[in-house]
Amino acid sequence: MTDVPVTFSQVECNGDTPPENGQQKITKITEGASDVDGTPPHCRVEPRLDVPTERNQEKSEKLQEDILLSSSMDEKILKEKPEEKLYVVHKALTDLSLQEAAVDKMALREGHQWEKIPLSSSNQEISRQKERISEQPLEEREDEELENTALQATEIEWLGFQKSSQVDLSHSKQDEEQEVWDEEINNDDDDDCKDDEDEVRVIEFKKKNEEDTQLKEEGDASEDSPLSSPSSQPVTPDEQPTFGKKGDFSRNAYSRYNTISYRKIRKGNTKQRIDEFESMIN
């Protein structure tokens, strides 16, 4: 048996292909030059463990270079065109997420676990806060919960006080508006009553003037009657007509109506009262 080191560019041994760049030590086993069976030579390949790790390192270095290039390009774009900031940020996030997914797939294929690239500082802060909360003892957590509940209770009380004050203000405004409305209605009623009273006074004054003129005409006619008929007997003072009494009666009726019915005149029945007054005088 002789061991001979041989280098192959592309050699298939037991169905496996060695890498293009790497050189492996191959031991060729021959049992003898004068072998009768003529069996082909058996190859044994010694695998190298450094090859997959070198590939993974190269891929990770390429990813880091791509990230640095994309970040530098984004900074240049932001300096040149600040209005495209949102678009660039969104694009950078999508690129990072795609690269992260590619790294995960590579790790699954190669059987190695790679560290994930953090997307932003906010995620790191959130994770740190969660770690701090988990590290805090239970007593501190309970104290913080009690403080939060107390703050919520004070906020609820303050909001309730504000609502009650607003309700009180609305009620007071409604009461004031109702009082003003009632005063306006009362003033309107008083004005209507005054107008009705003025109308009744005018009508009564006209009626009084008509009665006075009628009395004067009747007195003049009575004075002219004995002169026109000399044969007629003179009228004694006992038989004189009681025009004064009639006038007094009408005046008394007017004063009585003025004291009793005049005060009862209200809006809506003025015409009826005037008709009653005219019927009573006539």
Curated annotation (Swiss-Prot):
Listed InterPro entries: Ermin, Moesin_tail_sf
Organism from which the protein derives: Bos taurus
Molecular function GO labels: actin filament binding
Gene Ontology CC entries for this record: cell cortex; cytoskeleton; filopodium; glial cell projection; internode region of axon; myelin sheath; neuronal cell body; paranode region of axon
Quaternary assembly: Binds actin.
Disordered: annotated segments: 1-67, 112-151, 164-250
SUPFAM superfamilies for the chain: Moesin tail domain (SSF48678)
Cellular localisation: Cytoplasm, Cytoskeleton
Skewed-composition ranges (Low complexity): 224-237
Composition skew (Acidic residues), residue ranges: 176-199
Keywords, comma-separated and alphabetical: Actin-binding, Cytoplasm, Cytoskeleton, Phosphoprotein
Domain of life of the organism encoding this protein: Eukaryota
Residue numbers of Phosphoserine PTMs: 72, 225, 229, 232
Biased amino acid composition, Basic and acidic residues: 43-65, 200-219
Protein name: Ermin
Segments of this protein annotated with the region Binds actin: 264-282
Function: Plays a role in cytoskeletal rearrangements during the late wrapping and/or compaction phases of myelinogenesis as well as in maintenance and stability of myelin sheath in the adult. May play an important role in late-stage oligodendroglia maturation, myelin/Ranvier node formation during CNS development, and in the maintenance and plasticity of related structures in the mature CNS.
Chain positions with Phosphothreonine modification: 236
Lineage: Eukaryota, Metazoa, Chordata, Craniata, Vertebrata
GO biological process, one term: regulation of cell projection organization
